[in-house]
Amino acid sequence: VDYPPDIIVVNIRIKKMKTIEDMKLELLSDNSNKFMQTLIDYDIKSKDKYGSNLLHYYIMNYDSIVHPAGVIISEFIKKGLDINDKRKDGRTALYLSVQCQLQDIFEILLNSNADLDIQNVNGNTPLWEAVMRYRGDGFFIEQLLKNGANPDIKNNYGVSPKSLARTIAN
């Protein structure tokens, strides 16, 4: 098509940004290369209706995801994800790793300087959750205490990890 000289033709390709729902599906696929490629154009700070970011989703669906934790979490952090970001219920990635009993993810988050004492909406810390879930393996409790978690932080009901441990005889 010949246009008059006073008309400028602009050809713009608009690339649709992936939503967090799109990325959740990508994360569940078994194609790591495609996921990493898709991650390039993704706004890592996006959240779903529960306030979950992609790291929260990864942790809660860990058993269904084939992508290696170290690589994925490292990429999320490189893209600018705040590992201390909270869901609407106040749970952080570290809290979720304790709740889901995922030692490998827990260690990665500890080594990435996750905040040990952030409280959820009920005032519970990751250490409180570790004490509550204790079933004979003290890994999470030991690691949190060794790394400086405060056992005396009380939740909204006045219960600290230390007092909880005494109450349930842990």
Give, region by region, the residue ranges found by the protein language model:
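Ankyrin repeat boundary signal
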Residues: 46-47, 83-86, 116-119, 151-154
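Ankyrin repeat A-helix N-terminal signature
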Residues: 25-30, 57-67, 96-102, 129-137, ...
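Leucine-rich solenoid repeat scaffolds
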Residues: 145, 150-170
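N-terminal segments that cap or nucleate solenoid repeat domains
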Residues: 17-57
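Short, Lys/Arg-enriched N-terminal segments with co-localized hydrophobic residues
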Residues: 2-16
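Ankyrin repeat domain, specifically the short helix-to-loop turn at the C-terminus of the second helix
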Residues: 37-43, 74-82, 107-115, 142-150
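Conserved ankyrin/ankyrin-like repeat signature
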Residues: 34, 68, 72, 104-105, ...
